Amino acid sequence: MAKQNQDENLITLVDEQGNETLYQELFNFHSDDYDKSYILLIPAGSEPEEQVDVLAFAFNPDENDDSQDYELFDIESDEEWEMVEGVLDTFLNDENMR
């Protein structure tokens, strides 16, 4: 489960044991090919030039729901991972997108 804080696009991820970890949304996008939305997260408080692991998930945004809780889904296929990695590479290598 993810709980979103509107300030600075902070998201709290809760694991199976109930531990909460704070992340910041790097960006999100929708893929017409897979008809899914994706969100990429980095640890909150990371420095801009710091090398960090980026977490990626699929999610279903609900435009009519004001809830700040939503479900994240694992990306399961290799093809989806390749697409997400390609979008991330484009984001990281294009100064105009940051």
Swiss-Prot record:
<dbReference type="Pfam" id="PF06949">
    <property type="entry name" value="DUF1292"/>
</dbReference>
<comment type="similarity">
    <text>Belongs to the UPF0473 family.</text>
</comment>
<dbReference type="InterPro" id="IPR009711">
    <property type="entry name" value="UPF0473"/>
</dbReference>
<protein>
    <recommendedName>
        <fullName>UPF0473 protein LSL_1108</fullName>
    </recommendedName>
</protein>
